[in-house]
């Protein structure tokens, strides 16, 4: 089961993705529900106990373990993958190096007293095998990789504007304020 903050989907709808703190609360709920537990939903006086009502009655099956793979491109979301998830889905270079991402995952796992024995990590990367003599700006390369690259550029524009991150060095050659 893959789950993230909705960065791509929500931004496509003109909405911001879920913030990291509510995302952690959401992961706690999902993890508990998939374990068949009753979990507390809401805050303070508004909190209520919830659970799956129709589990095991032919509607859905949670008797088998359902692994959660957490989408995490920033350090705090990667730590949440270690705290609540069975795997991390990240991106390179946006999610940092694999070494950095795994250090963040370990931080979250340590915080929760979990081990990473069977933890699965995957990374979204752009890869293009060039034909002999083909250039990176060939029509084929642009057609195949352009949309994915531009989705990442749009993410960075939003992150610089909304969060205030510094423009990464690798994007500076095409960055125009």
Per-region residue spans from a language model:
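An alpha-helical appendage that flanks or caps ligand/catalytic pockets
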Residues: 16-59, 98-177
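Solvent-exposed alpha-helices and their adjacent loops that cap or buttress functional pockets
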Residues: 2, 59-63, 82
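Active-site-proximal loop/turn and secondary-structure-junction residues that shape catalytic pockets
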Residues: 5-9, 94, 125-129
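Short, solvent-exposed loop/turn segments at secondary-structure boundaries
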Residues: 13-17, 93
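Short, acidic/polar
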Residues: 72-80
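Flexible glycine/proline-enriched surface loops and loop-helix/loop-strand junctions
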Residues: 13, 62-66
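Hydrophobic faces of well-ordered beta-strands that scaffold small-molecule active sites
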Residues: 1-3, 68-71, 88-90, 119-126
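Glycine-enriched alpha-helix->loop->beta-strand junction motifs that scaffold or abut catalytic
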Residues: 80-89
């Amino acid at each position: 089961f893959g789950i993230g903050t909705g960065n791509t989907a929500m931004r496509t709808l003109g909405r911001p993705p879920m913030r990291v703190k509510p995302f952690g609360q959401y992961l706690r709920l999902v993890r508990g529900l998939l374990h068949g537990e009753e979990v507390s939903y809401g805050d303070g006086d508004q909190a209520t106990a919830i659970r799956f009502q129709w589990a095991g009655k032919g509607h859905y099956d949670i008797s088998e373990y359902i692994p959660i793979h957490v989408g995490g491109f920033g350090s705090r979301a990667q730590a949440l993958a270690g705290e609540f998830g069975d795997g991390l889905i990240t991106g390179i270079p946006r999610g940092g190096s694999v070494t950095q991402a795994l250090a963040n995952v370990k931080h979250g796992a340590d915080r929760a007293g979990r081990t990473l024995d069977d933890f699965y990590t995957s990374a979204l990367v752009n890869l293009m095998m060039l034909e002999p003599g083909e250039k990176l700006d060939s029509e084929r390369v642009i057609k195949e990789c352009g949309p994915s690259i531009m989705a990442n550029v749009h993410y960075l524009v939003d992150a610089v504007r909304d969060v205030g991150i510094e423009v990464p060095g690798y994007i500076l050659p095409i960055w125009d304020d």
